[in-house]
Design a protein with these regions (language model features):
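Activation segment signature within eukaryotic-like protein kinase domains
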Residues: 3-4
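Conserved hydrophobic alpha-helix
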Residues: 7-14
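Catalytic-loop of the protein kinase fold
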Residues: 15-32
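C-lobe/activation-segment region of protein kinase-like
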Residues: 37, 41-160
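Conserved C-terminal C-lobe helix
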Residues: 167-181
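Terminal C-lobe "cap" of eukaryotic-type protein kinase domains
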Residues: 182-208
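Regulatory extensions appended to serine/threonine kinase catalytic cores
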Residues: 205-220
Length: 220
């Protein structure tokens, strides 16, 4: 987890400068000098350039997939009312987009309702104008980073085993859950995500030091 610290710090710094990477995923992260760093800012944009994010959202909406690294609120925010109804209907009639099954698994890992329920809730919030556009855009990268590790262990039983086996994993997964909340108003901020990540790192590094000290005492 220590290797991921620059990713959380980078998230915080980008947010402070109102820059959205807009494409955080495994192939856009490299290992450099023992830590992970972001690369490929080809889809990045300034928070103020709303049309940039609108076009990216509509491009994905016109495809046949759910871009799994994007939150549903971003994918659907700029859709027409009839298009929103169509998306719900697609899932109801089993003509869902590619990756819908993955979305379902991720929500199960975090103890949430099905992907359909999440989409229905987001659609209702968009229709009722309950989602703030700026808050939604600021939440894109937070969601993308939060979903990374659970996706690496895609099979749900592997994720469940990891969480049951370790308090450390369980606490980090709780942070990932906050980062991937379906509604942007409930999603943790980049600054708070970094703060909580650092707190967890410090907590478990101290525990490791104590364990090492105890082992040395036993040997002596």
């Amino acid at each position: 987890m220590k290797m991921m610290e620059p990713l959380f710090l980078g998230l915080k710094k980008m947010d402070e400068k109102k820059i959205i990477h807009n494409d955080i995923k495994p192939i856009n992260i490299v290992l450099h000098d023992g830590v992970f760093k972001y690369i490929d800012f080809g889809l990045a944009g300034m928070l103020s350039k709303k049309n940039h994010f609108k076009q990216r959202s509509l491009d994905e909406l016109s495809s046949d997939r759910i871009y799994i690294y994007y939150p549903i609120d971003y994918l659907l925010y700029y859709a027409t009312s009839s298009k929103l109804d169509e998306e719900v209907e697609r899932i109801n009639t089993k003509y869902e987009r590619r990756n819908y099954d993955i979305l379902n698994i991720i929500h199960m890992i975090f103890g949430r309702n099905s992907g359909l329920n999440v989409i229905q809730e987001v659609v209702q919030q968009i229709k009722n104008k309950k989602i703030n556009q700026t808050t939604m855009i600021r939440g894109i990268d937070i969601y993308s980073l939060g979903i990374l590790i659970p996706l690496l262990f895609l099979r749900s039983e592997v994720n469940y085993l990891l969480k049951e086996e370790s308090d450390l994993i369980n606490e980090f997964y709780f942070l990932f859950s906050l980062m991937t909340s379906p509604l942007p108003k409930d999603r943790i901020t980049a600054s708070d995500a970094y703060k909580q990540f650092k707190q967890l790192l410090n907590k478990y590094s101290q525990k490791r030091v104590k364990k090492v000290s105890l082992k040395k005492k036993k040997r002596s």
